[in-house]
Amino acid sequence: MCAKKRSASSNRWLQESLKDKYVVQAQKKGLRSRAWFKLDQIQKSDRLFQPYMTIIDLGAAPGSWSQYVTTQIGKNGHVIACDLRYMSPLSGVDFIQGDFCNKQVLQAILQRLENKKAQVILSDMSPNFSGKPEIDIPKSMYLVEKALKMCRYLLIPGGTFIVKVFQGDGFYEYICSMHALFNTVKIIKPDASRSRSREVYLIAKGHKI
């Protein structure tokens, strides 16, 4: 019975993907995933990325967000991407494989920054989903809390943090934690985000020290 349910769910996801206009466009444009369009829509509404910026992309694989920001910050900008999974090389992206909370990995990021800090930190991370919100939401909150913690070490005063969060237990408490570190926090759901998904994006501006 469980196998049948998983099979039906997988088939439904596959059929949705085949019909998804963003999946089709991503394939035509040679993009790494449809998530590229989510960040593009965020950029068009908020104009967060500028030439020469240094940007850190946490949980970057397969690399669509890193791929996008390289088009916005120019050749003199700097993208540092980090993920537990391997990510195939991208022009203009400095990739570090590992857990960014690991001391050695964090040190590697700091070395790439050359004693500076980033203007923007991105996090589009998701856990491996089980399909059970009571399991998946806490796993997701654990990841976004780790990403928020990194802002203390890696983000400039006045900097911006963009993070994907799944609505559920701990969501509003997390927003309160963000308000403690940033001047403003905005909730946005890009059109490219599937309507049935619990995911939203939080844009936090004005990093406090």
Swiss-Prot record:
GO terms for molecular function: rRNA (uridine-2'-O-)-methyltransferase activity. S-adenosyl-L-methionine binds at residues 63, 65, 83, 99, 124. It is an enzyme of class 2 (transferase). HAMAP family: RNA_methyltr_E (MF_01547). Its EC number is 2.1.1.166. It catalyses: uridine(2552) in 23S rRNA + S-adenosyl-L-methionine = 2'-O-methyluridine(2552) in 23S rRNA + S-adenosyl-L-homocysteine + H(+). It comes from the Bacteria. Keywords: Cytoplasm, Methyltransferase, rRNA processing, S-adenosyl-L-methionine, Transferase. The active site is at 164 (proton acceptor). It is found in: Cytoplasm. GO terms for cellular component: cytoplasm. This is Ribosomal RNA large subunit methyltransferase E. Its main location: cytoplasm. Specifically methylates the uridine in position 2552 of 23S rRNA at the 2'-O position of the ribose in the fully assembled 50S ribosomal subunit. Belongs to the class I-like SAM-binding methyltransferase superfamily. RNA methyltransferase RlmE family.
